Amino acid sequence: MRVFNFSAGPAAMPEEVLRQAADEMLDWGGSGMSVMEMSHRGKEFMTIHEEALTDLRELLQVPSSHHILFLQGGGLGENAIVPMNLMGRKARADFVVTGSWSQKSFKEAQKYGTVHLAASGETANGFTHVPARAEWSLSDDPAYVHLCTNETIHGVETFEIPDLGDIPLVADASSHILSRPMDIAKYGVLFGGAQKNIGMAGVTVVIVREDLLERSMSICPSAFEWKTVALNNSMYNTPPTYAIYIAGLVFKWLKKQGGLTAIEARNVEKAKLLYDTIDSSSFYLNKVERNARSRMNVPFFLADESRNEDFLAGAKARGLVQLKGHKSVGGMRASIYNAVPLEGVKALVEYMREFEQRGA
């Protein structure tokens, strides 16, 4: 029996994608081979690779000024790869910290140059909001400004992207990429690990503006130098072939759903249902300011935290799994990515209401 999986990542996948991958496991397209067995330079995999790139560019409306790269290392790896690619000319970068992931980025970049905390969304209740542009204190001519546009742990999402003029904006969009349309032209660099909305763990998508390919540090490994990867069409080293194949299936699934505008409407409906349930109750609490609440990652706390394990056990018995909050913040977290159906969220809120009534 399939469960409703609320994991933050690796996360729920579209069942249609899983079934197609299963059907093609031993023989992709009449080739007599699994995708796992293909040469990454063979015509079969090159077809998969090019279709994935084309479909992703179409879904996100990526302009011709930007390259799409398939890399390895995950979002966490990009915390080092970004400064090594952008600090070659200016060894200073600014950071807007809105949660745990941008904190990690801020700390990692200190190994490669001077970093400046331009703004923080931390309050007495933890990370609960996104500082407005007027609150940012930018340094003089930084190499880039880094922003995590969706904080997976704290459930904080950035919806308003400021115009920084000539300063490149770097966005870690790992946990909400493909959940809604985005104006890619506003970003110098946008990256995301695959294991949320793109597919399975193993491939990292990096979208980088052409003019930023000439700014790498000499210490940057060639396998992670964006210019080298771009010139070689993400084939400089052996790419994560099966992860790219799965991502390609997800892209086609998204197109069949109506693209990102249609997906956004579904995600708004799911998030509203869950947040309304939390807000209408004195038994559950979400601490994030309403205009910064993530549509993808919804953390919440029980008024009586001694009942956390009972809540999780009861949820699991209902087929509602992976609801435990991150160890650094506790409580619960429901990650409701694209592949989590509305029926799953309805089942969760029904259980939440019943659990509250039993404890009343």
UniProtKB/Swiss-Prot annotation:
- What's the top EC group for this one? transferase
Q: What is its EC number?
A: 2.6.1.52
Q: Which reaction does it catalyse?
A: O-phospho-L-serine + 2-oxoglutarate = 3-phosphooxypyruvate + L-glutamate; 4-(phosphooxy)-L-threonine + 2-oxoglutarate = (R)-3-hydroxy-2-oxo-4-phosphooxybutanoate + L-glutamate
Molecular function as annotated in GO: O-phospho-L-serine:2-oxoglutarate aminotransferase activity; pyridoxal phosphate binding
CDD domains per the record? PSAT_like
Does the keyword section mention Cytoplasm?
Answer: yes
Alphabetized Pfam families for the sequence: Aminotran_5
- The source's domain of life comes to Bacteria
Q: Where is the protein situated, by its record's location annotation?
A: Cytoplasm
Write down any Gene Ontology CC term: cytoplasm
Q: Which family does it belong to?
A: Belongs to the class-V pyridoxal-phosphate-dependent aminotransferase family. SerC subfamily.
Name by which UniProt lists this protein: Phosphoserine aminotransferase
Species for this entry: Paraburkholderia phymatum (strain DSM 17167 / CIP 108236 / LMG 21445 / STM815)
